[in-house]
């Protein structure tokens, strides 16, 4: 389904009709950024730049209210909604996209202001889920490679679930399933686009929580933001200049999407990387040892996704890493780890985790502290540091191996968008530099742990025990009298 569009010049009329006021700013095309908000005169402190009525704020409460007006939408919402704010808002936007389509014929949906506003939103966003397959290959060797693949799988499963539910709802069956010519009022691509619009535009409001706010969602990001959003006593969402900012006529008005977001998260959610960000960090998935007999039990008990998080503050030499699962991964039965299936008070059976005879099921992510009760905690720390270092080294080598386009199975390089190539290259450069710094720091920590007197004594005793075992086995071999 082709997304309908309206020229941005028509936005002031739509805003006036729906009670949005922005007398001191205007929405305009910003070179290299798409749409943005610029001042329409010298701005004064404490004077709102924009005010949006609460009735236009799109959140879970607004979706529930809309469901009361549209029984057909309520059927769809009850069938596949109520999982999260995001899912409910996406279902609402899907209906508005269908209603706004000229090809729409099915008797579903009730028009509201968002039916028109969605026509002002971009037809694509430069987030990786909307890159072509060849463009997504540019992310090989970066932390986004697995994240984007997982997101694409999840989005496909989500839309399949929506369509499957729609098949039993007569009013929605024709909308979400292809016609004889193969077209449909809404497609998987529509769902992926709406997800991208949501992730790149959602705001965390002080009172209303996760919300999309028309017009305010046109404002671009800057680490040196000149404005911020809030909710006033009338529950309007307002845009205010920052107290320390001076915005001249014609200057772009910006807000901060979050100063601490890493490059991968910025690209994943917003489609760009802020080169002025002061924090470099990345998150990598972590796999348990293949030969660990307790691997499945550890994964089941841990529940969360096993990962390694590393970070570096550009303003200092300090680096940090964190991986709760790595600590669980590196302890075994001989250290004092045990899994037991016990019966609960209701007669059910539960997998419980024990560490040195103490039930630590509710502290499964706190083994960094729990290992202090081990005879040689520095030994386990050495194992963990080695595991994390090897995982980062593996990632670094992979990132470097795909740095050249010739190493990627891309069909036609000329079809790759420059924005995607530049973003992927910058992400790879940032993450490669970060990995090198953290690996070097981990090597220093590993050497220090290897020199620890308790570790040296333990490793020495293990070598002695192994030598004795080898000697004992040799003495038990029958003599050869030939």
PLM feature segments, named:
Residues 2-56, 61-64, 109-482:
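Long, positively charged leader/targeting segments at protein N-termini
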Residues 58-119:
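Eukaryotic helix-linker segments that join adjacent hydrophobic helices
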């Amino acid at each position: 389904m082709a997304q309908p569009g309206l020229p941005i010049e028509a936005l002031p009329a739509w805003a006036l009709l729906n009670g949005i006021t922005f007398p001191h700013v205007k929405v305009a095309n910003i070179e290299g950024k798409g749409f943005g908000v610029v001042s329409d005169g010298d701005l004064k402190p404490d004077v709102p730049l924009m005010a949006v009525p609460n009735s236009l704020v799109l959140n879970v409460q607004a979706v529930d209210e809309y469901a009361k007006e549209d029984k057909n939408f309520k059927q769809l919402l009850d069938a596949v909604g109520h999982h999260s704010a995001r899912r409910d808002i996406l279902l609402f936007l899907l209906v508005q996209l269908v209603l706004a389509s000229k090809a729409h014929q099915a008797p579903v949906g009730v028009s509201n202001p968002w039916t028109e506003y969605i026509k002002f939103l971009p037809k694509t966003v430069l987030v990786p889920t909307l890159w072509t397959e060849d463009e997504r290959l540019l992310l090989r060797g970066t932390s986004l490679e697995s994240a984007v693949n997982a997101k694409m799988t999840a989005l496909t499963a989500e839309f399949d679930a929506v369509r499957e539910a729609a098949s039993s709802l007569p009013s929605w069956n024709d909308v979400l399933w292809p016609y004889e010519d193969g077209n449909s009022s809404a497609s998987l691509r529509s769902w992926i686009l709406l997800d991208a619009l949501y992730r790149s535009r959602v705001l965390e409001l002080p009172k209303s929580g996760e919300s999309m706010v028309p017009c305010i969602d046109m404002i671009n990001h800057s680490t040196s933001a000149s404005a911020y959003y809030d909710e006033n006593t009338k529950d309007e969402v307002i845009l205010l200049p920052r107290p320390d900012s001076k915005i001249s006529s014609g200057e772009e008005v910006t807000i901060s999407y979050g100063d601490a977001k890493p490059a991968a998260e910025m690209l994943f959610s917003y489609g760009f990387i802020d080169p002025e960000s002061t924090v470099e960090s990345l998150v990598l998935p972590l796999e348990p040892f293949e030969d660990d007999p307790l691997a499945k039990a550890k994964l089941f008990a841990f529940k969360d996704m096993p990962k390694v998080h590393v970070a570096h503050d550009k303003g200092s030499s300090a680096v940090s890493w964190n991986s709760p699962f790595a600590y669980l991964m590196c302890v075994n039965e001989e250290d004092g780890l045990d899994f037991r299936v016990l019966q609960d008070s209701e007669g059910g059976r539960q997998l419980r985790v024990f560490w040195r005879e103490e039930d630590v099921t509710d502290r499964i992510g706190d083994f960094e502290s729990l290992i202090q009760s081990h005879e040689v905690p520095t030994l386990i720390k050495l194992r963990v540091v080695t595991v994390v270092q090897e995982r980062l080294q593996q990632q670094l080598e992979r990132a470097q191996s795909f740095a050249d386009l010739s190493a990627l199975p891309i069909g036609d390089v000329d079809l790759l968008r420059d924005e995607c190539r530049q973003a992927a290259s910058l992400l790879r450069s940032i993450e490669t530099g970060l990995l090198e710094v953290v690996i070097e720091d981990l090597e220093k920590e590993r050497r220090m742990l290897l020199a620890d007197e308790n570790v040296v004594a333990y490793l020495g005793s293990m070598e002695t025990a192994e030598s004795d075992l080898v000697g004992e086995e040799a003495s038990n071999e029958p003599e050869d009298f030939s």
